[in-house]
Amino acid sequence: MSECAFAASNLTAMKIIDIRGILNMEPVRGGTDEWYWATDYIHGDLYEAEELFRDGHPVKSNRLYLIHYPDGAVYEPVPPVDGQYLGYPVYDGGTVALLAVNFAEQVIRILRFSQQQETAREIAKLPLSEVKDCYNLILHTSPLSLTRQPNDGTFELIWPERASFSLSSRESLNFRDGDKLCFNIWYEDPDYREEMLVRALPDGRILERFPGDIRIMPNGERWLVR
């Protein structure tokens, strides 16, 4: 954990957040105002890093930092290891879940980080052969799930259970709600608009559709914006 200091300024007192010059800090997905994250994208995203590895290039781990609000404490929950690359984190049940793929060892690791422990603990380990590639390999909630949406009109649930079904290329998963998956879909006909599609697991059949977008708020409430 790095120390957070106050610096004198002609404008006002400022809290210094030292994350090695990485300026792309943003909120962790999943409805929290408590956690932010930043990474250096040294090889681009997870899929781009995988392509480099498959082409025989060395892959260094990206550095991923979690920043806690309001105290400004900075954590590096997963130590960098050559051949490893980190995906997007997500907030789940009071902890931050992290995705780490080790191309050298051919494994996918899912980890949880809590501020009390200050280190991430592994909760699942899968062979990398479980997926064709890491294109759109992302963690979602809730419950915590590993999903993949390749650019071929299919959706895959990889963990904790398996499911696969067809969907529109204009759909993207917003969140999971038990045995239901809530997708955003956009249209241009000709005006731009968005809808929510609620699909059932495991077959993906559509249960509901309605205009708007559901946002998960910091207190866990879901707001339908329309």
Name the predicted role of every residue range.
Residues S2-M25, E48-P80, A104-E130, T147-L173, ...:
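Surface-exposed loop/turn elements that mediate protein-protein interactions on large endomembrane-trafficking
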Residues E26-G44:
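N-terminal "first-domain core" detector
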Residues R29, V90, I138, N174-F175:
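Conserved beta-strand position repeated across blades of beta-propeller domains
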Residues T32-W35, G93-G94, T141-L144, G178-K180, ...:
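Short coil/turn segments that connect the beta-strands within blades of beta-propeller domains
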Residues Y36-D40, A97-A100, S145-R148, C182-I185, ...:
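Residue position within the beta-strands of beta-propeller blades
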Residues D71-A97:
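Blade-loop segments of beta-propeller domains
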Residues C134, S169-R170, G178:
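Low-complexity, Pro/Ser/Thr- and charge-rich linker/hinge segments at domain boundaries
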Residues Y135-P143, R148-D152:
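Long, charge-rich C-terminal accessory regions
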